[in-house]
Amino acid sequence: MAKLTKRMRVIRDKVDATKQYDITEAVALLKELATAKFVESVDVAVNLGIDARKSDQNVRGATVLPNGTGRSVRVAVFAQGPNAEAAKAAGAELVGMEDLADQIKKGEMNFDVVIASPDAMRVVGQLGQILGPRGLMPNPKVGTVTPNVAEAVKNAKAGQVRYRNDKNGIIHTTIGKVDFESDKLKENLEALLVALKKAKPSQAKGVYIKKVSLSTTMGAGVAIDQSGLTAVAN
């Protein structure tokens, strides 16, 4: 058996794996256990009551967190004409068409989000094998293929998170940084859960939000008592 590190022993002693924590208590615990030399992200895992094997029960979308994610996001936009100018004005770092595609083909990937206007998809389509595996391919379901590229850029900069269930029906995303105030993390979590409830597939039966867990980048997961979450209770 692998030897437990000092950090792992502290986590084991502090976190009760059988307990569901009130959100405020959970955040306080995560802050206490976040001892990395960088500001760790607070990540959430939401187990959904869906059959992920069925395409009509998959959950995918995006929402803007009210308090952002604490991350600086670089945005690339495929657009031309007035849309290109609007994207630049909204703060996009990279804007172009074939010239931007050529940069990406050369391996220049200095961005976190890719947005495209519908008329630019003829150019973006040829980049599927590069952008797809990295989760960067623009998609109308998450608002990254849109005629209003300026709004999409502003959303990305404001702390929009994209979500998509994995093969086990679990959503993984971030809701901020461990140095956020507890209330801000709770507000972000509530906003995500509201978005997930709105995205509930009509074919999903039974309990939809089955489990909510929070963790930091380097820490253990803490199960959340859903009775204290307005988004779940309502």
UniProtKB/Swiss-Prot annotation:
GO terms for cellular component: cytosolic large ribosomal subunit. The lineage of its organism: Bacteria, Pseudomonadati, Pseudomonadota, Gammaproteobacteria, Enterobacterales. The gene is rplA. Keywords: Repressor, Ribonucleoprotein, Ribosomal protein, RNA-binding, rRNA-binding, Translation regulation, tRNA-binding. Signal peptide: none annotated. InterPro entries: Ribosom_uL1_bac-type, Ribosomal_uL1, Ribosomal_uL1-like, Ribosomal_uL1/biogenesis, Ribosomal_uL1_3-a/b-sand, Ribosomal_uL1_CS. Binds directly to 23S rRNA. The L1 stalk is quite mobile in the ribosome, and is involved in E site tRNA release. Protein L1 is also a translational repressor protein, it controls the translation of the L11 operon by binding to its mRNA. This is Large ribosomal subunit protein uL1. Part of the 50S ribosomal subunit. GO terms for biological process: regulation of translation; translation. It comes from Serratia proteamaculans (strain 568). Belongs to the universal ribosomal protein uL1 family.
